Amino acid sequence: METRAILRGVRLSAQKGRLVADQVRGRPVDQALNILAFSPKKGAQIIRKVMESAIANAEHNDGADIDTLKVKTIYVEEGMSLKRFAARAKGRGARILKPTCHIYVTVGE
């Protein structure tokens, strides 16, 4: 039995999110949460929150035992970019792209 949690539109680049996701893929959830708690990266706290949501979903909806859960799949996809304007010399402007991403976490036994 597998349970999912999804967080969309996170203000984090997909590349930086994948660095954190690769560290916890396939691990037991207690070990994964421990790794995320002590990681200094911004994405670690965001992914930890999504993982806690997936664990709570598994416990509440499916009655799963937390001690046997593992991170089945975790992946980060690119979302829409926020387009911003930065003023430049001689009346010109430059476009600034602020990337977002979607985080998908699946836990199961």
Curated annotation (Swiss-Prot):
Swiss-Prot/TrEMBL keywords: Ribonucleoprotein, Ribosomal protein, RNA-binding, rRNA-binding
Name of the protein this chain belongs to: Large ribosomal subunit protein uL22
A single Gene Ontology CC term: cytosolic large ribosomal subunit
Keyword RNA-binding set for record: yes
MF-aspect GO terms: rRNA binding; structural constituent of ribosome
Annotated function: This protein binds specifically to 23S rRNA; its binding is stimulated by other ribosomal proteins, e.g. L4, L17, and L20. It is important during the early stages of 50S assembly. It makes multiple contacts with different domains of the 23S rRNA in the assembled 50S subunit and ribosome.
Keyword RNA-binding applies: yes
InterPro entries associated with the record: Ribosomal_uL22, Ribosomal_uL22_bac/chlpt-type, Ribosomal_uL22_bac/org-type, Ribosomal_uL22_CS, Ribosomal_uL22_sf
Record organism: Aromatoleum aromaticum (strain DSM 19018 / LMG 30748 / EbN1) (Azoarcus sp. (strain EbN1))
Subunit-level organization: Part of the 50S ribosomal subunit.
Gene Ontology BP annotations: translation
Family recorded in the similarity comment: Belongs to the universal ribosomal protein uL22 family.
Lineage of source species: Bacteria, Pseudomonadati, Pseudomonadota, Betaproteobacteria, Rhodocyclales
Name of the encoding gene: rplV
